[in-house]
Every structure is written in structure tokens, then in C-alpha cells.
Amino acid sequence: MEIPYNVELRKDTGLYNAKLGIWLFLASEVMLFGGLFSAYILLRTGAPLWPPIGEQGSIIHLLKDTIPHATFNTVVLIVSSVTMVMAWVALKQKNLSKYKMYLGTTLICALIFLIVKYFEYSHKIHEGFVPAHDTYMAIYFTMTGLHVLHIIGGVFVLGYLWGPGIKMWNSEPERFTNRIEVAGLYWHFVDLVWIFLFPVLYLLN
């Protein structure tokens, strides 16, 4: 049995079904990351020194070394959010070539973010700063690792919508445009999470 898809707005919410669904999903994501941020705040406020004493000097030095990478990644994700919006606008204007260009740029930005993150992780692990090293590194890898998984998930979805999924445009353009809007909301949320992670984990230590 196939579930019918409606592009019309619901009378009770003013949203179409897919958009209502993504907002409910993002609400659960807010609770997930909110719990992790709350745990971080409790750990930090309860510690006499942060990062934890012992290798404190080394950790702070390592953090300073990786701030440029994190700053670059922040700019990359902001650009990706802008191009995501422009891809959706291009579809509203029925310009498929511009849509592919802008969404392709979003994907490139996402891949750049992941590559930079890979080198950042490799550097930390090479220096011996693994999750088991101390409390700070444990929550650092937990929060940024979870964020990376969300980025990877977004890459798969956007890659599909840029590639084979684009066939829907020929038969159901409005439905396809809605899909891009829903995917964009997810992508903006992932970017917003990083906007909070960046200062909390890199700048305020």
C-alpha cells in the first residue's frame, strides 16, 4: 500500500506533510544535541580547571593549532547553507541547470568540511588525544563525531537529489521542490549545530 503524498498545505498546521515531518524530526534532534550541550556545561562548570588538569597545557596548545581549521570549516558550512537556499530558489524559478550548480557547490562544501575534519581528527589522534584521554576529549569526539555523522547523512541525501533523484523533476516538479526545501531545512540545522559547537569546543577553552 502506497502512502499518498500531498503537496497541499494542511489546514491545521499550514504546512505540507513532509515539512511538518522534518520539523518534528528536527525537534528530536534539538533534544539530542541539547542533552549533549547540557552535559558539557555541567562537566565544565563542575571542573576546577578546563580542560582537565594533567595535560592541560598540551590540550590548549592543540586547540589553538586547530582553531584555523575549525574557522575555515565554519565559513565552508555557512557558504553551503547559502548555496542550499539558492538551489531551492533556482527550482522555484524552474532553472534546473542553476539548481544543479548550486546544489553541487553545497556538496563540494560538505566534502571539504569532511576532509578538513579528517585531518583534524588524525592530528589529534597522532598526538595521543583520543576519546579515552580525558573528559574533554571524550565529549569533544562525541559531539563533533555525531555532527560529522549528520554531515555524512546529508551528503548521501543531497547527492541523491543532485543525481538519480532529479528524475522526479520531470514528472512531479512541485513535489521535487518540496523535497529540496525539506532537505535544506535539515542541512541548515546541521550547520546551526556547528555554529554552536565551534565557539563552545574551540574558542571558549
Language-model-derived ranges and their functions:
Residues M1-N205:
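...captures the hydrophobic TM-helix bundle architecture rather than a specific catalytic motif
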